[in-house]
């Protein structure tokens, strides 16, 4: 083909290229506009269309004449990207042969490619719409739950009469946090796409929607859990405070429980107080304090041990009763009640006939009676210490009374023989004889309190030994009702002996202190009577501590008779 023919063909191709933008297909317009050198723009292409650019460039290289392609290469080489990035797919060398005829088949892939580019964006828009709808729904649910919890807490505070304004600040914190979460995520401001940016592809839109939904669900769960726990804690605390303040019996019951103490605790406290008082006084003489003397003779220790034994026996009785039911339970209850009635009858008898107590008995008579009663209990206990204490108390009282009577007789004879001046000369002799045998009022008072404390301590010790032997060392089993009656006789004899001793002590005080003033003598006499009454009370309380011990003994005896109950131990 000649040169003229080539020029003619080139001109024809140029005219065809100029007429192509007038085509009706929008896909062809877009493709040709991108391929033309005049359409080169300095604006950066979106990231979503970076993958489409190499294909379009290749297609343009195939359908563009060499002259135009060279010009586009030169212009592209002169221009640099705005972002400073150089892409490898921007310039593609045309190595294939260029056809001068228009390729009609290239129009169809361009249309399909354009449709493929449009479909992901529309799909992403639909995903973003669903994401915003879900986030708005969860946000509204979170806000509703937060407001509900706040309303519950406010209602509880109003019901419990809580008017403190400071309590409102911690209550409003969870609600503000929930409102802040719901306010940051709104349907109008979608975090997956900006207001002016094009929609992302389908995969990016779905990932953004899922992450947003996950964050909202996590925040909602945290707010619901935290708010619920705070509400429950708030209601519980305020309820307990109101109950403690409004219940009239709550404080009274608590006070009574704190004041409830045992007899041994009271005696120990009295002992400690007396020690503190004596520590402040720099005295060497022995003082007549009943609590300290009672502890010196180990009465307090035996009383505490008896209390512990009684409490353990009581717990055993209760645990055994819970293991029974029906007829067996009723029979056992009747037996235990009958044992208790014996002790109750003894208390009422002591209150009704207090004048029968305090019958005077000699030390030998009391020792004989005590030995017989212990033998009836079938326990190997000998009252040696108690008998010695009783004998010691009776001996010094009798000795003091004899000395006082001799001194009184001598004084009366001398008064009859001599009068006037002779009386003045004989007064020193009377003082010498009296000082040798007779005791002073303070000494008699001291011996009285000491004897009462020693005798009472020995009585408590004897009852403690009897309780131990009833539980663990009986030679022969005896019905609990009979043992209860014997124990009542034993404690009655002890109380009568203590009362008799206190009366003897007061008589001795009155005789020795006949020359003393009433202001000095009467407090001593009253103190001896008071300590004697306290001693009998301690012995009676120790008897009541033996009731659970006898009940346990009866349960064991009944179990041995049945010989078929595994609960017996």
Swiss-Prot record:
The keyword NAD does not apply. Residues 1-87, 102-126, 165-208, 404-439 are annotated as: Disordered. The keyword Cytoplasm applies. Its main location: cytoplasm. It is found in: Cytoplasm. Pfam families: DUF719. The modification Phosphoserine is found at residue 262. Keywords: Cytoplasm, Phosphoprotein. GO terms for biological process: angiotensin-activated signaling pathway; connective tissue replacement; fibroblast activation; fibroblast migration; fibroblast proliferation; gene expression; heart valve morphogenesis; inflammatory response. May play a role in neuronal cell development. Belongs to the FAM114 family. This is Protein Noxp20. It comes from Mus musculus (Mouse). The gene is Fam114a1.
